[in-house]
Structure formats: structure tokens, C-alpha cells
């Protein structure tokens, strides 16, 4: 059986993302695969190329042939040079700088703000009408009576 290492397409219309797979040469592009050995996101800066080197070396050693796009990716990661015994096996893969954590960003913004807002609110707070305030006080009083009655009922049940 002829085996190829090729790309299957994932993602949205203008945001392609690929999986690097090992599949029978006769299967269609997004068809059934034998094994997924990596992923490739070309739209990120720098492009994300994540290929399992150990599994790639195994499949190349048993005769799997990479397609042209995959061959370029393997040369970037250094897997092709490692397989062929050529110099440059370390590859020339660019690594993205690590993103700061959200906690660090929050603490930095808090330090800039000196722990509090520097300006007043842009909209004045709405004034509560007298009727709504009276209703709120009444509902609070009713709620307190209900909880007191419930507590008394609980006490009666426990004493029995």
C-alpha cells in the first residue's frame, strides 16, 4: 500500500488550518487517515507548525512519501534533513513570543490606574423614585418576616 504524508484542510473560508496526516495515497484530501502527526496554521504570525518528529521519522523510515507542501514543512522543522542525514537538522522554525497571562495584564492595568478610577462616571446615576424606594423597603420587611416565621417553624419541628 502506497502511503503519503499530506495535509487535510480545516478552518473557515479565509482562515485555513491544516492537519498533517499519514494516509493511503488513493484517499481524497479530507478522507480517512491512518494517523494524525501534526498541525499547520499558516495565517498566524509566525505560522504555527507543530509536527511530531518521532512519528514523522517512523513513517518516513517505512516508506511514506511526503507531498510537496509537507516536504517544505518538514524542511522548516528539520525533520527531512534528520531523515536524510543532511546538515541543518535543527531547522529554521520561528517561535512566537509567549503571551502574557491575563493576571499579569490585569495587575499592570491596576497599577497604571493606581487602584481606582481617575475620573467620575460618564453618566450620572439614575435617581430612584420615592415610590420604588418605599416598595423596596416593604419587600425587605416582608422578606424578614417570612424568614423569621420559617425559622420558628423549623424550631418547632426540631423540638418534637
Curated annotation (Swiss-Prot):
Protein's UniProt keywords contain Ribonucleoprotein: yes
Keywords from the named record: Ribonucleoprotein, Ribosomal protein
Pfam families, A to Z: Ribosomal_S16
Molecular function per GO: structural constituent of ribosome
SUPFAM superfamilies: Ribosomal protein S16 (SSF54565)
Chaperone in keyword set: no
GO cellular component terms listed in the entry, alphabetical order: cytoplasm; small ribosomal subunit
Region ranges (Disordered): 115-139
Biased segments, Basic residues type: 124-134
GO BP annotations, alphabetical order: translation
Domain of life the protein comes from: Bacteria
Similarity comment: Belongs to the bacterial ribosomal protein bS16 family.
Full protein name: Small ribosomal subunit protein bS16
